[in-house]
């Protein structure tokens, strides 16, 4: 993951096209070091463009020391983030992924001169297949253009509400975005808001490779018998994706480590298809566990957990 603050650079407006910015070797002499994960304002404060907002009265809206998104417009806090990275030789003949865990609020994802993805919403991760554009064993470039929320809102109280109500969220317009509502002002942060509304790459970005089938988003639902809690019925679900251009037949296997419980299913996937596969205790009786080791709160017992291993093979 690109975590260290100087592994990415940041810049606002530039006349260079995205195709050029996202090429390896692009000159970033006028760019600033970026804080990733972090926000645009986080990086600007780090580079002494603006003072620390938590110091004194620096963040007060009426002092206008740090410009507010609602006054400046979205372009003011629209920034490019850029870095270069190597793709290992052992990624050859595999599917190469760029996983972006969280960007606020909209973003264009460019790799080696190509627009490979768009994101919107603060909390939705994106899995971008860069196999056809990655340069194995060579230098690669990643450039991300990040846009603020569509509706920044203001600290002006909304027109409706109960008498004496604390006006968290200002005029409420920030709620039209899928984002962090407290960015416009809340009683346990700044009453008058975060100036850039937390625009930026706020979670990790990862590069990795997989085989021709991929599993994601495993989920386990436990149903305990009552009143004795001496039986646990486990339902396991997982998403399986075929990122290739051909149909595949694959096998998903599961194992509850240390319990001698295994289960598996075969399935066919068309090219680019994603399916959710489900293992139920009705279909797999071994998923009914007798006398399960339960998780107990502190001072009530041991916080027991089971370990589940899921694999997919072709």
List each language-model region with its residue ranges.
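Secreted/periplasmic carbohydrate-active enzymes, especially glycoside hydrolases
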Residues: 3-7, 11-314
């Amino acid at each position: 993951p690109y975590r260290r603050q100087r592994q990415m650079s940041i810049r606002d407006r530039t006349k260079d096209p995205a195709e050029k910015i996202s090429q390896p070797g692009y000159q970033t002499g006028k760019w600033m070091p970026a804080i990733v994960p972090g926000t645009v304002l986080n990086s600007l404060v780090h580079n002494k463009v603006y003072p620390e907002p938590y110091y004194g009265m620096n963040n007060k809206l009426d002092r206008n020391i740090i410009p507010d998104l609602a006054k400046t417009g979205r372009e003011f806090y629209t920034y490019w983030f850029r870095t270069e990275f190597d793709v290992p030789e052992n990624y050859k003949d595999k599917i190469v992924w760029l996983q972006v865990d969280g960007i606020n609020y909209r973003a264009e994802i460019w790799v080696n001169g190509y627009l490979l993805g768009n994101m919107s919403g603060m909390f939705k991760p994106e899995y971008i297949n860069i196999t056809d554009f990655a340069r194995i064993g060579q230098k690669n470039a990643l450039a991300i253009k990040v846009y603020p929320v569509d509706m920044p809102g203001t600290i002006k109280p909304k027109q409706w509400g109960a008498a004496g109500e604390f006006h968290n969220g200002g005029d409420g317009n920030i709620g039209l975005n899928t984002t962090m509502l407290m960015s416009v002002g809340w009683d346990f942060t700044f009453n008058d808001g975060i100036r850039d509304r937390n625009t930026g790459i706020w979670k990790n970005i990862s590069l990795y490779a997989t085989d021709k089938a991929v599993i994601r988003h495993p989920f386990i639902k436990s149903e305990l018998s009552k009143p004795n809690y001496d039986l646990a019925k486990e339902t396991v679900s997982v998403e399986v994706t075929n990122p290739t251009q051909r149909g595949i037949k694959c096998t998903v296997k599961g194992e509850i480590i240390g319990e001698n419980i295994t289960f598996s299913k075969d399935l066919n996937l068309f090219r680019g298809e994603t399916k959710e596969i489900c293992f139920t205790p009705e279909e797999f009786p071994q998923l009914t566990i007798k006398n399960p080791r339960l998780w107990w709160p502190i001072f009530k017992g041991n916080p027991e957990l089971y370990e589940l291993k899921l694999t997919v093979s072709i």
